[in-house]
């Protein structure tokens, strides 16, 4: 057997894959091998690690110097049928039938990536097969192009409009200030280079893309000699190469005429660095501004509180010293540059980072929310502050804080939006795509040790970095993005002109033919026989027993000699521990509940023990990885097992409560210092810094305003659910539209009064008692547990007092327009923008019942079939989904970036009626069960495993009930699913609350509802 990790085999080939390099990756306790296929040029990088969650990713360099969105449209389109899998949507069929822990497609400015992950090997290879066929051998027919990209449609009144999934998705992207400001900044810094264009597509330019250009793009960029296949996990390299060789290599050789003198030739097989075709290498060239200048752009005013003003410097290639410099200058609010910008009151929020997504980075320092006329003040402040920091030096505390922050980040294992291997994939591709060795960015801990050595050796090291990157560069770019109230009007006018131009050249006969073909294609419902080509795992092959994280309950003696509940979650945290100290807020009068989110935010931001907030932040950053305020609310499910579970702990008063408190994370070697500081914070919290509270208030308002559009789906859900029960009403008060009204009411002149209120709330919460939760590994626990009794006394933790259950009558005064939540008319959340969101809520069965499991299966099938076909594929929305929250006894349907959100609700309700008379085939039910099972076995990070297990205990829903849900799931039959469909339809006739987030144009002629004001 070929040994891929034997250096003696470098230069030798296995099935024509030449082993080029072996990389030791001690930072990740792994090693990697780099190979190139000597006939096709396909390259492979496999990070070999003892991890059963294997990941593959087909990646292609896909650069374009237009904003027509061809890379993005291609990303969608290759997943719409291929040679071996000639379905409408193999991707969604695969996603709805596999055990994947991650399955996606991602368009970056310089590449397109198709990753998939699974903990089941057979399932992993199934996904690799379907994805490989999709990227190398897609159908790419004209119907797919006009469905996913752009087309002209005509409504019932004869009015023309432009439609398309990507087109509508990107209209949503052009609906708020911040993403447009960032995009314009990047365009300015790299003029006439690929980053200056929108790889996702600008809706005003997407219709310029022709079908032939689309086909040519695939031919050019999706060839095997431009494919970078990233692999991660414990499946042996030879098995993966055997699979690629068997399924694809021969077909690729034939398709691309891979022979001497053929379409692919002149490959430098022995090159230790990636081979990049010359035309692609030319596209990778970045252009830079050659002299300092001032630039101004306009962006939509939606989400803005003023202009974005920044000073920018080119910084060269990415490396760890730039990350260190960012952390020193702006790693936390007390860092010197961040502090100066905040204290200036010239803007709402600090912007400082190195833009590292390209081969060359640039630093950006400035402010959001700058009032007109203050731009020059911001530029001068940034330069003046950097000069002062250089002249005066950086304090040791700021350096220690930065070192702690980076050390912690490099040690912590997180799942942000997928497996940890996705982060390794991105690090690898950053070098690989640009012609650097694949391991260039895979030694961050080792690299940072060199930075720490420089810090130890040279006291002026940080000063020299400031001089190198900020004071010496001859090119400085002053950038301003102003909010424009005319932005949407101007784009709408441009879109109207575009449609008029299209109409002038429109061949209406051909248009009708194209649309007829498209609609026939979209309306075709694939049979089980057709979808059977997608490989699946059978229910009989599934492990019935699943991994369940555990949390144990112990007690320690509190300051009042009572037993304080101590929850312990033992997980593999890599020498890090997480501690929650929580206090109930459910003994407060209801009028204070609306202020809980801001109260939690400020807990660690106003200082303690007589020290200023900045001093406290700097000190805590040297000891802890982080500390922040948190809230937690919920209810005990109305299920006999959950009620019985909660009854077991009734004497301790911790089940079914609402909590506020602190969570901190720290390295175990700093445990004693960290716990002492946490006790000091809890007992010596200050509420007297009026000036800083005003700053935090301004930042909160800006944050809420900036995020309104992007959180539209969340706001519709919470709004539509608010009238159903007390817990959901509280969610609306704290996190929904009602919270926006609360934040709008915060005024600077009330800061003193608010501090007094927060002080009262804090004291009342502390008097209500407390609980502690620890997540750490076994070695850390041995060190921590002896410290906890002393900590509980120092922190003055006391026995939990009984809580109060708020009634709807108590809560309703704090829900804006509460009467609108009580009927089934649509609640219209009106905002400016170019797209929308919808939510519809109907009743479901109770938690842990077999009926609930069947409803979960039906909802998943509905999402992946009917809603996908009718709302996403035909309707043009970017997404539509349905799921069951049986804890709250609700079925939730939502749409995302939806051009017709009101119509989507109508389609959903009509579909329920139609499906009652159209049974779902047994094979489809079984596939959906397998997919739902896959959701149950997705791995979690150590921190998240501990948190979920702990939170489950607080609400009578321990993680072991997850096994009950899996057992019920595996027993679901097609008859159960039919009955679930009937229940959905019957429930919808009785009660369906609805909310739509969009501009006024979303309303249809027949839609009636309540208009709900969106403030800020």
Where are these regions (language model features)?
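His/Glu-based metal-binding/catalytic segments typifying zinc-dependent metallopeptidases
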Residues: 48-52, 57-59, 167, 171-172, ...
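Non-catalytic terminal extensions that flank enzyme cores
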Residues: 2-55
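C-terminal regions of mature proteins
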Residues: 2-8, 233, 402-570, 715-819, ...
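Acidic/histidine-enriched segments that form metal/cofactor-coordinating
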Residues: 2-5, 81-83, 90-217, 323, ...
